[in-house]
UniProtKB/Swiss-Prot annotation:
It comes from Bacillus subtilis (strain 168). SMART domains: Ami_3. Optimum pH is 8.5-9.5. Zn(2+) binds at residues 10, 24, 79. Residues 180-254 form the SPOR domain. This is Sporulation-specific N-acetylmuramoyl-L-alanine amidase. InterPro entries: MurNAc-LAA_cat, N-acetylmuramoyl_amidase_3, SPOR-like_dom, SPOR-like_sf.
Amino acid sequence: MVKIFIDPGHGGSDPGATGNGLQEKTLTLQIALALRTILTNEYEGVSLLLSRTSDQYVSLNDRTNAANNWGADFFLSIHVNSGGGTGFESYIYPDVGAPTTTYQSTIHSEVIQAVDFADRGKKTANFHVLRESAMPALLTENGFIDTVSDANKLKTSSFIQSLARGHANGLEQAFNLKKTSSSGLYKVQIGAFKVKANADSLASNAEAKGFDSIVLLKDGLYKVQIGAFSSKDNADTLAARAKNAGFDAIVILES
């Protein structure tokens, strides 16, 4: 059993960075909760604990103490940047060596593959959560809240889902996580494109009509997915609703 501690940065009276009508504390929680859902629904042999699951203040000491007392195998702190830049970067504590450096490289690479963010590189910093955690720790900075282009991406649920998916893919690779040994998931797909911009456009259209969407890169195509279910009946119901809304929806069983 791999024990992963997920830390959505800031919260409560501490909003974190702000800009373009967004607050960092809200975005970090959205990414963390989406990541928890993916890991819980799609993987086995993984145990999760979050530093917070709502808009509450948690001190830095309480965050690392919770992870240390729980005996986590990995500490993942999720943040959003500010300062006028653009793109994604990740941090580990200086001079920690393997396996932390390996985990950083793997997760960083998977996030970059999953989202349309510039790669600002793998970095080190003397952050509290990296220094005081008793296990390998990584802090990710997911775009710049005060840069309009980054903020516009962070405002869409499909982009938040893609960020969560990138983190999940990285954790799968880093810790050799196994997919749940079920009969698979029935996924509702409304499009597949060679050009990511076309997939993003369809995803935005779906969101405007009330569907949660995510863009996934698989087999060389950017696929727009609006749901995944263990029950085919639930998938069929969503597909029918999507068709009524004008989308060319199909249900795909993936093991």
